[in-house]
Amino acid sequence: AVIFGGISREHELSLASATDVITNIPKDKYEVICIGITRKGRWLYYPGDVADIATGKWELNPDCTSAVISPDPLHRGIIILENGEVSIRKIDVVFPLLHGKSGADGTIQGLLDLSGIPYVGCGLLAAASCMDKSHTHMVMDDFGIKTAEWRLITQRELSEIDECCEKIAGELGFPLIVKPANSGSDAGTSYADSPESL
């Protein structure tokens, strides 16, 4: 199964990833079950064309129907709710192609672990740890793994943002890459080459 979409602001990136993966899975060897998650968090079984995933039109398909992951390891699969009837589609493995919140933060990995469904990618702890960039840097530092110089500005420090920016510019110099600690991909990332742009 391929799970795509999601509630994060990286929804479109997830659709692009899913399109690439689905397109490259050999259909003569594997049956691909597509589960899309709308921006509002609705889970839908999607039996339509992969091209509509790329454009975001997939959720308008009248053949979409509500779906959830079975939490019971004895009934491993996707529960599809259609016309008042429930069916389970057994699955062998999941490609969780969600990005950002509820996808790359360990949430989907935890759900799949609970359900006993194997999946591609890192596990819950690694995903959760790596979603928070400051936490990742601290872990790497503890293990003596070199990373780029970095500084964290906390919510409390935002009231003194000018002083924080001045201190960071003095310690690190320019140019700087500014990134939210808890966003995936390049969401919210900016380039600062001066105190004003920082």
Label each residue range with its predicted role.
Residues 6, 32, 47-48, 121, ...:
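Intrinsically disordered, low-complexity regions enriched in small/polar residues
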